[in-house]
Amino acid sequence: MGVTGILQLPRDRFKRTSFFLWVIILFQRTFSIPLGVIHNSTLQVSDVDKLVCRDKLSSTNQLRSVGLNLEGNGVATDVPSATKRWGFRSGVPPKVVNYEAGEWAENCYNLEIKKPDGSECLPAAPDGIRGFPRCRYVHKVSGTGPCAGDFAFHKEGAFFLYDRLASTVIYRGTTFAEGVVAFLILPQAKKDFFSSHPLREPVNATEDPSSGYYSTTIRYQATGFGTNETEYLFEVDNLTYVQLESRFTPQFLLQLNETIYTSGKRSNTTGKLIWKVNPEIDTTIGEWAFWETKKNLTRKIRSEELSFTVVSNGAKNISGQSPARTSSDPGTNTTTEDHKIMASENSSAMVQVHSQGREAAVSHLTTLATISTSPQSLTTKPGPDNSTHNTPVYKLDISEATQVEQHHRRTDNDSTASDTPSATTAAGPPKAENTNTSKSTDFLDPATTTSPQNHSETAGNNNTHHQDTGEESASSGKLGLITNTIAGVAGLITGGRRTRREAIVNAQPKCNPNLHYWTTQDEGAAIGLAWIPYFGPAAEGIYIEGLMHNQDGLICGLRQLANETTQALQLFLRATTELRTFSILNRKAIDFLLQRWGGTCHILGPDCCIEPHDWTKNITDKIDQIIHDFVDKTLPDQGDNDNWWTGWRQWIPAGIGVTGVIIAVIALFCICKFVF
C-alpha cells in the first residue's frame, strides 16, 4: 500500500499539473493573448505585413474589390478632354472584371457614335452589364466618326466602370465612369458587407430625396469623333446648339441653357441655331465637385457675348429674314428686338433630369438675368444651297444677374460641410437665397444640386449634394457611405499630426480624400476596414473598432499607388505587344529567307526595321517608386495626443486574456485545495 501510494502521488500531481497547463493554453487560445503586442511606433511596414499575413488575411473571403474613379485624381472631366483619353483599335478582345463597391461619380459618360455609313461604332452591352449607378452629371454624346477599330479602349490603361463590372471597352448607350480597381481587407469575412441586389431599385414620386440618387443628363452632338478635328455642340434642343469648349463646366452649361431658354433665343425655324461663347467669359460658374474642401467661390456674372449662325436644312428658305432691331441705348435694358422668328417661346427645354431614377423633362426654367441686345456688325454666310443668310450677332448683358456666393468655411478638425446656396429644381420655382442686392437672387440652374443642410429650404427639391459629413452618410441610408480612417492612423501613413487642410495641400492636387460608396450595406459592417497594400488591417489592435476618419493622405496615397501601378502595367502591355510583333516579323523573315527572294528587308520593306523597345528601366523605376513610397518607409513617431488610439486600447484584448488566466489559476487552486 505504501509503495502504491508513493507511486500514485506523483501521478496525481502530474494530472493536476497537466490540467493546469491545459487550462492556461485554452484561455490563451480563447482570448488570443498577443505575444508580440506593438508597444512603440518604430514598427516597420514589413512587420505589419507579417502580422497581417499571419493573423488577419486568412481567407480570400476577406478581400473586397472597390472601384476608384479617375476624377478623384484630378483628371479633366469635360467631354473634349475626356474623349481624347479613348481610342479605337482592333484585334484585342475586351476584358471584364467585377468589383463590389464604387464611388459616387461627379461626371459619367454615355456614347452613341455611328460611322458615316450609318453603322454602329460601339458594340452593344452584353447581358448583365448595366450603367454606372451613381452619377451627378451624365454627358451623353451622339454623333459620327470614322471609328478606326472594333472597340474603344482607354489609352492610359484604365477601366470603364459600369454597375459593379469594369471593362476595358466602351459599350454603346451604357453609362460609365473612368477608374481603376483596388481592394479592401476586412478584419473577418463578412458576406453581407456589400449589398448584392441590383441598384436599380424601384422608386416612387414620394420617396425621400435624401436617398441621393439624383442625376442630370447633358446632351452633346459630335462630328469627327475620335479624330483631332472633332467638333462638339452642346444641345439645347434639336435645333439650338452651343459650340462646346473644354473650359465649360457642367454648371456653366446648365446656366447657359437656362439663359438661352428664358431669353427666347431658341430656334423655331427649320435651320440650326448655333451659339458661340465669347472666349473672354469666365466659365467657372456654379458648384465645385462634391469632394472639394475649398468652396469660396464669390464673383458677379457681368456679361456674356453670344453670336449665332443659322444653318438651313433646305426645308425652308430663311435667307430673307431681317436682322433683329434692337435698342441703340446701351444704358437701358429695354428691347425692341424682332428676332422671335428664330426663337420659339414654348418649345421644350433640353435638360433631362433623372429624379429618383426616372427621367423627367424640365417643364419650366426661370432665369434672373436681364437680357439686353445691342446692334453688332452683320455678316453674311453662303448656305449649303448657295443662298445668303444674314447672321446677326447679339450681346447678352447679364449685369443684373445675381452675385453667386459659395462660402465654405472649414475648421481644422471639422468633418462637416458648411453653407452652399440652395438650388431650385424642376418640381418648383426657384427660391431667392442671396439678398446682397434688391434684384439679386439665386442664379443656380434648377438642375444644380444643393447641400444636405439646405435641401429642405426648397419646395419639391429632388436632389442632394453629397458632402463629406457623417450626418450625410446617415441620411443616405442604405445607398451611400463615406468611409474614413482614424485620425491617428492617417498620421501614421502621412507623417505626423496634420490638419485636414494641410493634408490636402500636401496631397496630390485635387485628389479626392473621401470615398463615397454606393453599395455598402450598413455602417456597422464597415468596422475595421483597411486598404491593401500595407494600409492594415489591425496590427494587433491598431484598427480595433469604428469607422475610419480623416484618411485624406491615405486615400490620396492609394490613388497615386493605383495610378502608378496602372502606368507600370501599361508599359508591360506595350512591351509585350511589341515583342509579339517582333516575333511575327522574325517568323516571316525566316519563311522568306528560305525562298531566296532577296532577303528579309527586300521583301518586308520598312517593317524590317521594327525592333522592340526596352522598357525595363521605366518599369523598374515605377516599381521602385512604389516600393519607396509605400513599402520601405517606417511609421513615424507619434506623440501622446496622436497615439492614444494605438496606446491603451490595444491592451484591451491582452488585459482580458490575462485577467481570464488569473481567474482560471485562482479557480484551479481553489478546486485543488477543496478536492485534495
Curated annotation (Swiss-Prot):
Keywords: Clathrin-mediated endocytosis of virus by host, Cleavage on pair of basic residues, Coiled coil, Disulfide bond, Fusion of virus membrane with host endosomal membrane, Fusion of virus membrane with host membrane, Glycoprotein, Host cell membrane, Host membrane, Host-virus interaction, Inhibition of host innate immune response by virus, Inhibition of host tetherin by virus, Lipoprotein, Membrane, Palmitate, Secreted, Signal, Transmembrane, Transmembrane helix, Viral attachment to host cell, Viral attachment to host entry receptor, Viral envelope protein, Viral immunoevasion, Viral penetration into host cytoplasm, Virion, Virus endocytosis by host, Virus entry into host cell. It comes from the Viruses. Changing N641A: No effect on release of soluble GP1,2delta. The chain crosses the membrane at residues 651-671. Changing D637 to L/V: Increased release of soluble GP1,2delta. A lipid is attached at C670, C672 (S-palmitoyl cysteine). GO terms for biological process: clathrin-dependent endocytosis of virus by host cell; entry receptor-mediated virion attachment to host cell; fusion of virus membrane with host endosome membrane; symbiont entry into host cell; symbiont-mediated killing of host cell; symbiont-mediated suppression of host innate immune response; symbiont-mediated-mediated suppression of host tetherin activity; viral budding from plasma membrane. Residues 315-337, 373-392, 402-479 are annotated as: Disordered. Residues 672-676 are cytoplasmic. A motif (Important role for host BST2/tetherin antagonism) lies at residues 660-664. Changing C121G: Reduced levels of expression of GP1 and GP2. 50% loss of virus capability to enter into host cell. Changing D637E: No effect on release of soluble GP1,2delta. Changing T634I: 50% loss of release of soluble GP1,2delta. Residues 1-32 form the signal peptide. The keyword Magnesium does not apply. Changing K95 to A/E: 80% loss of virus capability to enter into host cell. The signal peptide region modulates GP's high mannose glycosylation, thereby determining the efficiency of the interactions with DC-SIGN(R). N-glycosylated. Residues 414-432 have a biased composition (Low complexity). This is Envelope glycoprotein.
